[in-house]
């Protein structure tokens, strides 16, 4: 974490400075008042300036923040991302499985029942959410003997009985030179708003039919979108779905901007453009989102998503609750406000107490004469006795560390 590294670097210089200062203080008071006074002031400097408060300022706040996040079902895999999150200005979302519910359902298809059952059996071999929805849509329990191949961002290919089957998007069929008839295109167009997720099924060079799937927006997506608007945070949807469907969802949620019909590579290029505008947060769930999750400044992965997506995300939403993103943002702001307070206290404490331990008040008092400052209860007399013994210096050091700990404990509270 950048701020932790900076504090560690300062602490290293601070220790060297204090050792040098203690030596100078010892030499000064040895010449001025003798060894007894020299040992007193040098020991006080070493004890009161122990960099515990400085060293505790960042790590204890982070530990408590991570603990708070865990209680709210947010797994922080990369603590450095917690520092960046508070600076985020753009929140970018995948749609399917992220803003919409993971569970898909078959809305309509124009396949024969035997072809539909065959497609569902083939999809049973893929871990993709669309494949899971299809595999559970058929009551037939077919046993297949063939060669399965997953084609990322496009679909699957299955070779069986001297035939090649394709199941996936339009780009997959175009890649293998399979044309789609006007009847199939019209079928897709008639369902593109209600069921924007389309799976084409082809055998050799013939498109057998189309399956249209649908899923609803997550209940909490509206709450997150409202939070982003209230905090003047820009929101974007990057989706591979058709434009009409994405536009409808963006309108429902009040998302500021959207891009549709994107491949995984298109998403990466779009994300890189957005990163030129500021710190970007990307939220995704699928295998196709893994590259974008890795590239983003800060990333959230859904726990129900693919293992690859979860390994790439900086945060994992354990309960798949999008409202946890808003909580993490508030936690990031609170954590670094407290870290700044801790660091201010640590530096303020050292700036005030080290001169006292070094005997500066006594030294100043030695230049003040009674006629100039007045009576026996003069400022000079007060300053002359204003010094710290080693045991008082040690107590002051303990108090400074305790103050940092108590301030950090405020991170245990629920942020609402």
What is each PLM-predicted segment?
Residues 58-67, 105, 133-137, 294, ...:
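Re-entrant/interfacial helical elements at transmembrane boundaries that shape
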Residues 3, 12-23, 44, 48, ...:
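Hydrophobic alpha-helical transmembrane segments of multipass membrane transporters and ion channels
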Residues 54-122, 274, 292, 414:
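Conserved catalytic phosphorylation-site environment of P-type ATPases
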Residues 68, 174, 231-233, 253, ...:
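Membrane-embedded alpha-helical bundles of multi-pass transporters
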Residues 160-162, 203-341:
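Conserved ATP-binding TGD loop and adjacent catalytic N/P-domain core of P-type ATPases
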Residues 13, 39-57, 381-402:
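Small-residue-enriched core segments of transmembrane alpha-helices in multipass membrane transport
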């Amino acid at each position: 974490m950048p701020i932790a590294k900076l504090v560690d670097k300062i602490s290293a210089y601070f220790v060297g400075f204090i050792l040098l200062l203690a030596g100078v203080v010892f030499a000064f008071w040895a010449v001025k008042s003798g060894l007894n006074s020299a040992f007193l002031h040098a020991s006080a400097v070493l004890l009161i300036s122990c960099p515990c408060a400085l060293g505790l300022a960042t790590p204890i706040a982070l530990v408590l923040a991570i603990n708070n996040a865990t209680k709210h079902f947010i797994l922080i895999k990369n603590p450095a991302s917690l520092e960046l999150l508070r600076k985020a200005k753009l929140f970018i979302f995948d749609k399917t499985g992220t803003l919409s519910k993971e569970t898909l359902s078959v809305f309509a298809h124009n396949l024969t029942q035997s072809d539909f059952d065959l497609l569902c059996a083939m999809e049973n071999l893929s871990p993709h959410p669309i494949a899971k929805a299809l595999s559970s849509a058929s009551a037939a329990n077919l046993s297949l003997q063939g060669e399965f191949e997953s084609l990322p961002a496009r679909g699957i290919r299955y070779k069986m009985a001297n035939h090649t089957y394709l199941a996936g998007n339009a780009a997959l069929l175009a890649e293998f030179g399979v044309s789609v008839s006007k009847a199939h295109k019209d079928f897709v167009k008639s369902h593109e708003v209600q069921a924007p997720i389309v799976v084409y099924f082809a055998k050799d060079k013939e498109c057998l039919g189309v399956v249209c799937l649908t899923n609803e927006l997550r209940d909490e997506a509206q709450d997150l979108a409202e939070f982003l608007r209230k905090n003047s945070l820009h929101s974007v949807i990057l989706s591979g779905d058709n434009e009409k469907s994405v536009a409808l969802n963006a309108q429902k949620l009040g998302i500021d901007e959207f891009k549709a019909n994107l491949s995984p590579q298109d998403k990466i290029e779009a994300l890189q453009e957005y990163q030129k505008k500021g710190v970007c947060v990307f939220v995704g769930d699928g295998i196709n989102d893994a590259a974008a999750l890795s590239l983003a400044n800060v990333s959230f992965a859904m726990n129900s998503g693919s293992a690859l997506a979860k390994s790439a995300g900086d945060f994992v939403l354990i309960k798949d609750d999008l409202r946890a993103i808003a909580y993490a943002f508030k936690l990031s702001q609170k954590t670094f406000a407290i870290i700044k307070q801790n660091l201010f206290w640590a530096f303020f404490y050292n700036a005030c107490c080290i001169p006292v331990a070094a005997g500066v008040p006594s030294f100043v008092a030695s230049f003040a004469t009674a006629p100039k400052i007045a009576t026996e209860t003069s400022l000079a007399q007060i300053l002359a006795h204003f010094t710290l013994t080693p045991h008082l210096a040690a107590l002051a050091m303990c108090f400074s560390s305790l103050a940092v700990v108590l301030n950090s404990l405020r991170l245990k509270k629920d942020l609402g």
